[in-house]
Amino acid sequence: MRLVVQRVTDASVSVGGETVGEIGLGLMVLVGVTHEDTSEDAAYLAEKLVNLRIFEDEGEKMNLSLLDVGGSVLSVSQFTLYGDTKKGRRPNFTKAAKPDQALQLYEEWNSMLRAKGVTVETGRFGEMMDVKLTNSGPVTFIMDSKA
C-alpha cells in the first residue's frame, strides 16, 4: 500500500458537485493499493499513520500525532499512485490492484483507523472526485507498507 499524507487545516472531497466528505484539522490521505497488498499492509500503515508525530507542539516542533491533536482523516482511494511513467508518455497502471481487491483493502484500512478512535471521512471509490485542501506547512509524506 502507498499513502500520500498531507497535514491539513481543512479538506473536502466532492463528486458531481456534491460534498461527500469533509474534515477540519487532520490528514488528507490518498490511498493506493497494489495486488501484493494484504491486511497486514493495511494494519501497518494504519498504526503508523495515527501515531506519526507530524503535528507541531507549542514549541513548533513536529512532536504530536493525529491522536494527540484529535484530528480526522479524509481518505481518498487513488489507483494512480501505482502508475508507472518510465516508458512512453502514457502511464501504465498494471501495478495497481484490481478494483475488487483495492476496494476491500481500502475499506478495511478505513475501518482500522476508525477502530483506533479516528474520525474518517471518505470519497467514493471508483468515482471521479474533486479534492480541496489547505495543506498546513506544507507538510506532505509518502508512506509505503513495503520498502
Curated annotation (Swiss-Prot):
Keyword tRNA-binding (UniProt): yes
Listed Gene3D superfamilies: D-tyrosyl-tRNA(Tyr) deacylase
A Pfam family annotated for this UniProt entry: Tyr_Deacylase
The keyword RNA-binding is annotated on this UniProt entry: yes
Gene Ontology biological process terms from the UniProt entry: D-amino acid catabolic process
EC number(s) reported in the record: 3.1.1.96
Keywords from the UniProt entry: Cytoplasm, Hydrolase, RNA-binding, tRNA-binding
InterPro entries the UniProt entry points to: Daa-tRNA_deacyls_DTD, DTD-like_sf
Class of the enzyme per the UniProt entry, highest EC level: hydrolase
Motif (Gly-cisPro motif, important for rejection of L-amino acids): 137-138
Primary location recorded for the protein, binned into one broad class: cytoplasm
GO molecular function: D-tyrosyl-tRNA(Tyr) deacylase activity; Gly-tRNA(Ala) deacylase activity; Ser(Gly)-tRNA(Ala) hydrolase activity; tRNA binding
Subcellular localization(s) per the UniProt record: Cytoplasm
Any single GO CC term annotated in Swiss-Prot or TrEMBL for this entry: cytoplasm
Catalysis performed (reactions): glycyl-tRNA(Ala) + H2O = tRNA(Ala) + glycine + H(+); a D-aminoacyl-tRNA + H2O = a tRNA + a D-alpha-amino acid + H(+)
Function in brief: An aminoacyl-tRNA editing enzyme that deacylates mischarged D-aminoacyl-tRNAs. Also deacylates mischarged glycyl-tRNA(Ala), protecting cells against glycine mischarging by AlaRS. Acts via tRNA-based rather than protein-based catalysis; rejects L-amino acids rather than detecting D-amino acids in the active site. By recycling D-aminoacyl-tRNA to D-amino acids and free tRNA molecules, this enzyme counteracts the toxicity associated with the formation of D-aminoacyl-tRNA entities in vivo and helps enforce protein L-homochirality.
PANTHER family referenced in this protein's UniProt entry, alphabetically: D-AMINOACYL-TRNA DEACYLASE 1, D-TYROSYL-TRNA TYR DEACYLASE
Swiss-Prot/TrEMBL domain comment: A Gly-cisPro motif from one monomer fits into the active site of the other monomer to allow specific chiral rejection of L-amino acids.
Self-association and partners: Homodimer.
Family: Belongs to the DTD family.
Protein name (record): D-aminoacyl-tRNA deacylase
Source organism of this protein record: Bacillus licheniformis (strain ATCC 14580 / DSM 13 / JCM 2505 / CCUG 7422 / NBRC 12200 / NCIMB 9375 / NCTC 10341 / NRRL NRS-1264 / Gibson 46)
Gene name per UniProt: dtd
